[in-house]
A protein has these predicted regions:
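Acidic, histidine-bearing metal-coordination/catalytic regions of metal-dependent phosphoesterases
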Residues: 2-3, 19-21, 27-141, 162-163, ...
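Bacterial N-terminal signal peptides that target proteins for export
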Residues: 4-19
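Acidic/histidine-rich helix-loop elements
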Residues: 78-97, 140-155, 180, 229-233, ...
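Extended active-site neighborhood of metal-dependent phosphoesterases/phosphodiesterases
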Residues: 99-102, 110-131, 184-285, 312, ...
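Conserved, compact domain cores that house catalytic/ligand-binding motifs in diverse enzymes
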Residues: 137-206, 211-212
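Active-site neighborhood of phospho(di)ester-bond hydrolases with catalytic His/Asp-centered motifs
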Residues: 141-143, 169-175, 203-209, 254, ...
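Non-catalytic positions within long, well-ordered alpha-helices that form the structural scaffold/packing
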Residues: 161-163, 282, 318
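Short acidic, glycine-rich surface-loop motifs adjacent to enzyme active sites
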Residues: 177, 258, 284-301
Length: 428
C-alpha cells in the first residue's frame, strides 16, 4: 500500500476511530440458507461494466463442474456469430465461476449472447452497449436488500424492474446479502433480481459490511463483481473501488467499510481512496457524476455516525460538486445536502445530493442528528419504508424518484444544469 501523508481533513479523528472500532456491528448467528446446488447449465449470468461500456462488456457466470468457458455473441440485427474464450475465476458454494470480456463492440448497438462450453449453453440474452458520449438513459438505485430476501425484499426488487423496464443499469449500494459467504443467500439475491435482469443490464455494485467476514471480503464478490480494473493501487480494494463511464455519467464505487480494513489500517484504506477519488474527479470528461458507497456521509439512523467518512471524503465530494451520492447501511430513507448549499428558495439548493435508502425489510429508526453534526440538513426522511429509486438522465437534467413497491412516489427532485448553473429542486 502506498504511503500517504496524514490528511488535514481527518484532524482529531483518533478518538472517533477507536470508538468506531469498538462499536463495529457484529453479525449474530442464526439459521440461514445453505449452499445452493449449481446447475450443469450455466446460471447466475450477470453483466458487469468495463471502464468503456460503449465498446466492451464483461459477463460472469457459474456451473457445477469445471469446463472450458466460452461466450458466443452476435449483433442482434444479424450477421455471423463470434465465439471467444472466457477464464475460470474460482469456486464458491459448490460452483465453478467464469468471466469473459467482449471487446471491439460498436457503441449503441444491441448484441445477443450466450455462455457455456461449446456444447452446453445458457439461453440467449440481449444487451445494448452504451452510446459513445452523452445520451438519455435511466438507471435504478437499490439500497440494502440483505435480509429476508425472498419474502421481504424480492417483491420490491421485482416492482423496480417492472417499473423501470427500460433501465440501462442498476446501482447496488451494498449489503446485497446478510452473510458474506452464504451461497443460499446469493441464490436468493439472483432470484430476486431475475435471470433476464441480471444478464441483460449492467450491475454496478459496491460492497457493504455484510459482504465481509472480519477482514475478508466475501469469496463470492470478485466472482460476481470483478470491477473494472481502474481503482486505487491497493490489492485490498480490488473490485470494490472503480469507475465506469456511461453515456455522460461517471459512476464511481468507493469502499467505505473501514472497520473491515486489514489490521484496522483505516488511514491507508480511506486516504488511498481519497487520493484516487480526487484524481478520478479532476480528470472527468462527463457532465454528470454519481458516487456510491455503503456507509453514509451523514448517518440516517439512531446510534450511528458518519464522522469518519466525512473526515476523508466530504470535502472532495463537495469540491468537485458530485451530483449524487448513493448510500445504504442505515435501514431507513434520507435525502439532504449541506446547509451551506441552501439558496433563498427553500425548495432549491446547490451542491451534491446525499441519499440513504433501504430496499429490504430490515428497518432502523431515522434521526437527523448526524446530518446536523455534519453541517447538513435533511429534506426527506422516512422510517419503515422499503424503496427503489429511478434516475433519468437527459441532457442538462437529472430526475430522481424514490418509490415504494406499489409505485407511490415518496421523494423526488430534479437537478438542472442549464441556464445560470446547477440547481437542485424538490419535487415532493
Amino acid at each position: 500500500v502506498p504511503t500517504v501523508p496524514p490528511s488535514p481533513r481527518a484532524a482529531s479523528r483518533g478518538a472517533r476511530l477507536l470508538l468506531a472500532g469498538a462499536l463495529a456491528g457484529l453479525v449474530l448467528p442464526f439459521a440461514v440458507p445453505g449452499d445452493a446446488h449449481a446447475a450443469t447449465t450455466p446460471e447466475r449470468v450477470l453483466l458487469v461494466p468495463t471502464e468503456s461500456p460503449a465498446t466492451s462488456q464483461t459477463v460472469t457466470w457459474r456451473t457445477t463442474t469445471a469446463t472450458a468457458p466460452k461466450v458466443q455473441f452476435t449483433a442482434a440485427s444479424g450477421g455471423a456469430s463470434v465465439t471467444v474464450d472466457g477464464a475460470r475465476t474460482g469456486t464458491a458454494g459448490g460452483g465453478t465461476y467464469y468471466r469473459a470480456t467482449l471487446t471491439g463492440l460498436s457503441p449503441a448497438t444491441d448484441y445477443r449472447y450466450r455462455v457455456g462450453d461449446g456444447t452446453t449453453w445458457s439461453a440467449w440474452f440481449t444487451f445494448r452497449t452504451a452510446a459513445d458520449g452523452p445520451a438519455p438513459f435511466s438507471f435504478l438505485y437499490l439500497g440494502d436488500i440483505q435480509n429476508d430476501i425472498t419474502a421481504g425484499a424480492a417483491p420490491v426488487v421485482r416492482a423496480a424492474y417492472a417499473d423501470a423496464s427500460d433501465a440501462a443499469l442498476t446501482v447496488h449500494a451494498g449489503d446485497l446479502v446478510n452473510n458474506a459467504d452464504n451461497d443460499g443467500q446469493w441464490a436468493e439475491w439472483f432470484a430476486a433480481v431475475g435471470t433476464d435482469n441480471g444478464a441483460s443490464m449492467n450491475h454496478i455494485a459496491t460492497p457493504g459490511n455484510h459482504e465481509y467476514s472480519g477482514w475478508s471480503l466475501s469469496g463470492h464478490w470478485p466472482l460476481h463483481f470483478p470491477g473494472t480494473g481502474n481503482g486505487p493501487d491497493d490489492d485490498d480494494l480490488d473490485g470494490t473501488a472503480y469507475y465506469t463511464d456511461y453515456q455522460g455519467v461517471r459512476f464511481i464505487s468507493l469502499n467505505s467499510n473501514y472497520t473491515n480494513a486489514p489490521w484496522l489500517d483505516i488511514v491507508d484504506w480511506m486516504e488511498d481512496q481519497q487520493v484516487w477519488l480526487e484524481g478520478v474527479l479532476a480528470d472527468n470528461p462527463n457532465p454528470w457524476t454519481v458516487v456510491t458507497f455503503h456507509q453514509p456521509v451523514f448517518a440516517n439512523s439512531e446510534g450511528r455516525s458518519g464522522a469518519v467518512v466525512r473526515d476523508y471524503w466530504l470535502d472532495v465530494l463537495e469540491e468537485y460538486d458530485v451530483d449524487l451520492v448513493l448510500q445504504g447501511h442505515d435501514h431507513s430513507y434520507g435525502r439532504g445536502n449541506l446547509v451551506a448549499n441552501r439558496t433563498d428558495d427553500p425548495d432549491v439548493h446547490t451542491g451534491p445530493v446525499y441519499v440513504v435508502s433501504v430496499t429490504g425489510p430490515k428497518m432502523y429508526t431515522p434521526t437527523a442528528s448526524d446530518w446536523q453534526r455534519g453541517g447538513a440538513e435533511v429534506r426527506t426522511q422516512l422510517g419503515d419504508t422499503q424503496t427503489y429509486q429511478i434516475v433519468e438522465v437527459d441532457g442538462d437534467e437529472l430526475t430522481y424518484q424514490a418509490k415504494t413497491a406499489d409505485g407511490t412516489v415518496v421523494d423526488a427532485f430534479v437537478i438542472d444544469k442549464g441556464g445560470d448553473g446547477k440547481r437542485v429542486t424538490d419535487l415532493s
